[in-house]
Amino acid sequence: MDSSTDDTDHAEYRSTELGSESPAELRESSTEEYAVVADSTYSRAQFIEPSSLGYIHIGATVRPRSLPLTLLPIGREKTELLTRLKERARHLEELEAVETATIFETAAMPPLHRLPYIKEHKDSIHLARFDVAVLIETKSPAAAREVQETQAYQTLMDAIQNAATDVHVMASRNEKRIGDVDKTKQGVFIFNYFVADDPEVMLELFDYLAGSYVAETGLDNSTLLVPLDDENADYVAINNARWDIGILRFLWRELTNKSLRSFVQTNLKANQVGAMPVLYRLA
């Protein structure tokens, strides 16, 4: 499915000069319930058919760093935890219903509580300060539920819950996909945790946010995960992607690209969407 080539399947795209109207004025003038406020700087990302796999994302707050980026060692206790989790992930991969189970640790985390939408809705948002993340890929979305009933999964969860002060679990499916995320080799990985006033608006806006990163960073992979229908999740969606680049170079490119930063921040604000991006590496 290529969502960039058939706008009739989407809400109306309304092009406007950034800053010429307020977000409220733009919304009032829109005739579509799910219209996205965006300028024409970037086009929609080119998507392929969503994956048929199921996913279980686990985010855990174990011992997040006080600084957004630090190159210091993570400490003995956390190192031992990650070693245990990787061992238990290997046991999970022995299950017929599991494709892969991958453990991540943070490489960089911005001050999420200072982000505009997050700050404005601080009393209702689950802050994604997850310095440890697990992504389990299952044979199908239905299989994700089956995996959660297994002893191998519960053993993994016990190890996480014993070490973490906060845990969030989201059984999910793939809603939109640029390409598969290669988790077999090191790189800069992102889990971007989305919240929004209107989930449909967020999903529509994602086409343009992803398109901006394709254009500016050469992004060629991304899997946007949304909760299963019966899942009680705190996030509208979680996006996973990878860049084959070092963390310092990635951050420098992000901080110095004013055009990309302006486009993303302006359109998040205009659409009442919050994004909490956390960068990871393979543990």
For each predicted feature, which ranges?
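Short S/T/G/P-rich N-terminal loop/turn motif that feeds into the first structured element of a domain
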Residues: 1-2, 6-131, 139-143, 163-283
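Acidic (E/D-rich), amphipathic helical modules within compact regulatory domains
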Residues: 133-161
